């Protein structure tokens, strides 16, 4: 499951997660809407390996700014609260899975 989080939840959950994938997106973004079901599927297939979160850049712009998000969708892979890799734009599930596994 991909959990939508606000700023407080991000600090309390995503930043404290051992390994997390954060999806920075917006409701009006077409590629973001295409990516959402891909991430849901991956979150089920990779359950127990990492936590999946979604941040709406319009609702929490300060987080987007902190992570240098200038284009969406933007995926940030985090380990122990620190970003380790970033992917911008839509990618099919198999490519995303390979990217994640290559960075965790």
Question: Model features per residue range: what roles?
Answer:
Residues 2-20, 61:
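A short beta-strand-turn-helix
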Residues 12-13, 63-66, 99:
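CheY-like receiver
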Residues 17-19, 36-55:
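Conserved helix-turn-beta segment immediately C-terminal to the redox Cys motif
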Residues 18, 25-28, 71:
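Short pre-active-site segment immediately N-terminal to redox-active cysteine/selenocysteine motifs
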Residues 20, 61, 67-76:
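Structural micro-motif
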Residues 24-38:
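Conserved redox-active cysteine motifs that mediate thiol-disulfide chemistry
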Residues 58:
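Adenine-nucleotide cofactor-binding loop residues
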Residues 79-104:
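Non-catalytic, surface beta->alpha helical segment in thiol-disulfide oxidoreductase systems
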């Amino acid at each position: 499951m991909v959990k939508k989080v606000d700023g407080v939840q991000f600090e309390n959950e995503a930043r404290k997660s051992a390994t997390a994938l954060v999806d920075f997106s917006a409701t009006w973004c077409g590629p973001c809407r295409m990516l959402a079901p891909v991430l849901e599927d991956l979150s089920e297939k990779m359950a127990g390996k990492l936590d999946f979160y979604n941040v709406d850049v319009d609702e929490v712009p300060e987080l987007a700014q902190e992570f240098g998000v200038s284009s969406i969708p933007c995926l940030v892979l985090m380990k122990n609260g620190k970003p380790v890799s970033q992917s911008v734009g839509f990618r099919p599930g198999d490519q995303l899975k390979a990217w994640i596994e290559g960075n965790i």
